[in-house]
Amino acid sequence: MSKKSKKIDMLNGSLWDKMIVFALPLAFTGMLQQLFNAADVMTLGRFVSNEAMAGVGNNVPIIGLIISFVMGLALGANVIVARCLGMRDDAKANRAVHTAFATAVIFGVFAVLLGEAIAGPAMDILDVPDVVRSDAEIYLRVFLLGFPFIAIYNFLAAVMRSQGDTQTPLWALVAASLFNIAGNLFAVMVLGWGTGGVALATVLANAVAAGLLFVKLLKTEGALHLDLKQLFKIDREALKPIVRIGWPAGLQGAVFSVSNLIIQAAINSLGPAVMAGSVAAFTVEINVYCFINAFGLAATTFVSQNYGAGNLPRCRRATWVSMGLNFVATFMMIALVVGFGRELLSLFSDSAEVIELAMTRIYWVVLFEPISVIMETVSDAMRGYGYSMPPAMVTLICVCSVRIIWVWTVFAAYHDYIVLMIVYPVSWAVTAVALCWLYYRHQKILEKKPRFAKQTAEA
């Protein structure tokens, strides 16, 4: 790996050390992305009110739905650019880079228009209590104005990730996070703008992150170079696989968010304290998922490059090495979050009741995250092969059906917070089993392809 270019040779040599170098900055990037929400929640919880904090928390599933979808689309760009690099076709990779940027801008603007139109009805669907509705709707409407910047950042980060550069997006987000924290405090403590001011600071911070990556790629030479004259030039040959792979991946992420909307509505029926506790716990627990997601994306990128190079055995090794490293990282994060949970939660609220309710969620969600390791790794590995729609459909059917049935039957019968939280590990387990079966079937299909028949026979 070259320090200057920050590229990683995914086609040769050992895998585990390169995956760690690839995944750790990506995990920290994910944590910093969550820090945007955490900074907003902490600022409002500490300097405004628990109601303001709960109002922002009600938007987490909605914002998560849109962001999950754009990250899924960006994954399509990651896979295609990585495959082109594996094939040593820099010209094709560059066309995909410009297509990815144009797609990000178009989707970002569309998301703003759609989001602003449904912001009010979304509050009704979630049955947001009147006491927090004003804060929730103000935050969502202002936040959505910055969505084009979120889309641009995620697509450009995916492009950089395709050649192993996960450090530049991290440092861009570090700068943006510092800006966000300072902006939040200035908006609330100096200007007294409350929820709207906090949301505006987040919009500007997202613009900083996107702008830094944009400038970086303008100055980059080679396959990933952005040319101002071709920014909105869409190559149909590149767009089709980006959408074909990215659309199902985005759908899968959105499915989780839709199911979380259903769970959020159930949480809202349990009162403001439970709402605040759930928000605080989610803000802490999501950091565990950042590591799971990072090593899953490592599987996607390493598999994609090696699949482009025609090396199926190395694709398989990349999948299992990624899963092993993922387990190690996840268990370490679980120990940290569970061991220091109360101390971390005290940053969001000084209410003993809220903290205990938050710990309840952490016990029932975080301790079962290893199931997610299996689910995410096999799903992300299949996307690296360009096999994206089937994993998305399996997730759609398993996650949504289990969670909807659980909320409408088991939770409806007992109406208890713990009963509601149990739906997370149950839905993960069902989905993980189904995805493992799908992965096995897909590998058998690959073995029959002429380009891989000799490799699998020798293995």
Positions of PLM-derived features:
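Transmembrane helical elements of multi-pass membrane transporters/channels
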Residues: V21-D40, V142, A176, A205-A209, ...
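Hydrophobic alpha-helical transmembrane segments in multi-pass membrane proteins
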Residues: F22, L26-Q34, M71, T103-V112, ...
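Alpha-helical transmembrane segments of multipass membrane proteins
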Residues: A38-M42, L113, P121, F155-V159, ...
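Helix-terminus/linker motif at the lipid-water interface of multi-pass membrane proteins
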Residues: M31, L35-A54, M123-D130, F186-W193, ...
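Small-residue-rich hydrophobic transmembrane alpha-helices
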Residues: M53-L113, I150-P169, G277-G341, S372-T395
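Short runs within selected transmembrane alpha-helices of multi-pass transporters and secretion channels
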Residues: A74, F143-R161, P169-N180, V198-L213, ...
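N-terminal transmembrane alpha-helices
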Residues: M10-V48, P61-G76, I80, V105-V112, ...
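Short alpha-helical transmembrane segments in multi-pass integral membrane proteins
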Residues: M1-A23, V81-G146, V188-W247, V303-F368, ...
